From Swiss-Prot:
GO biological process assignments: tRNA pseudouridine synthesis
Gene that encodes it: truA
A Pfam family assignment: PseudoU_synth_1
Gene3D superfamilies tied to this protein: Pseudouridine synthase I, catalytic domain, C-terminal subdomain, Pseudouridine synthase I, catalytic domain, N-terminal subdomain
Protein name stated in the entry: tRNA pseudouridine synthase A
The species this protein was found in: Legionella pneumophila subsp. pneumophila (strain Philadelphia 1 / ATCC 33152 / DSM 7513)
Summary of subunit composition and partner proteins: Homodimer.
Keyword Isomerase: yes
Amino acid sequence: MRIALVVEYDGSQYHGWQAQTGLHTIQQAVEFALSKVADSSISVVCAGRTDTGVHATNQVIHFDCEKDRSIRAWIHGANTFLPKDICVKWGKEMPENFHARYSAVSRRYRYVIYNGAIRPGLLRGNVTWQYRQLDHRLMQQGGQCLLGENDFTSFRSVECQSNTPMRNIHQLQVTRHGDLVVLDITANAFLHHMVRNIAGVLIAVGSGKHPVGWVKDVLNAKDRKLGAETAPSYGLYLVQVTYPKEFGLLQNNPGPLFLWEK
C-alpha cells in the first residue's frame, strides 16, 4: 500500500529535510512518527528536499507499508508522535505509480521579506528582514526576464549536484502587503539555492543597488560569482506541489497563515 501525506513544518530548528547522521532533520522526525504508527520501520520520499531553516506549508511525501491503517490513523497517529513544529495535514492512498518527487509537474515557493525599519520579533525565523526600502514593482519587473526555460547557472549553488542547470519558471510575482514583500515563484523544479539566489538578486534591484536590467545580465552571464548574496533561508516556504489530475491530490491554501490570498 502506498500512502501520500501533506506535511507542514517550521524548519527553524532543523538541519533541513534530508536525514543526516547526528543532525536534527525533518525527515528523521517524520519517519520516527510514522514508524511508531506502523509498528515497523517506515522510509519516506518527499517532493522537495528543503534546506536548513526552510519551511513548508504543503510538503508532499509518500511511503509504502503493508500494515492496515486508515488514513485518519496515519494522520492523527503521526501527529501524536511529531514535535509541535511539524504536522501532517492531509493524506490519501495512492496507486503504485505515484511518486512524491518524480510525479510532480511543478513546485511553488514563497519568499517572505519583512521590509521595515525595526526588525520583527514575533515573526523572527519566519521572515527575512530588510530595513532598506524595497520597491516591489522594480523587483517584479526584473523578475520577468527569468520566465520560461533558461540556464540558471548564475542562480545555483556551487554545491548543486543537478546534471543540468536548465529549469522552466512558470510564474514569478512580487507583491507587497503592508510591510511584507512576497516573492511567489513556480517552476518545474528548482536547483540548489535557486529561489534564495533569485531573491538575493531581486532584493538588490528593489533596494536600488542595481538596475532592473542587471537581472538579465546575471542570467546571461552563467556565472554564480556575478550574482547577489544568497538570501537567508528563514523567509522561504515550499507552499505547493502540483501533480497530474489523475492522482487527485488536494490543493491546499499555499500560506503561510500570516499571509492572505489576493
